[in-house]
Amino acid sequence: MEVRRNTFPKEEHLYGQTAVDMLFRKGKSFLAFPVKVTYLVTTDELPVRCMVVAPKKKFKHAVDRNRVKRQLREAYRKNKFGLQDWAVSHEQQLHFSMVYVGDRLMPSNVVERKIKVALEKLLEKLG
């Protein structure tokens, strides 16, 4: 039996100008407040790659942006297995981003609950 670890290693981070540009140019998006999710089914070596964004326009202080990004990463890390299972079973690769669009800080448990809903909505859209 394979043990699943709740980690978010660097290989699962979506970065690099070409990958990010392609995601925002060709990807589809939806709003699941407080995040806007943009996703793209692609050809890549890893099943799922994710990027989190906290815009400077909404949060002027770096400490607030860092808190939001930490909350988003933590919520994704705990709830990522549904997406990974979908990608493996459909033999697809998925790139997606979560952009925090709320203008207020929220407690971590609320953010996690909302991210869980956003990830379920993403799975629903993927089919």
What label would you give each PLM region?
Residues M1-G127:
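Positively charged, solvent-exposed patches that mediate nucleic-acid binding
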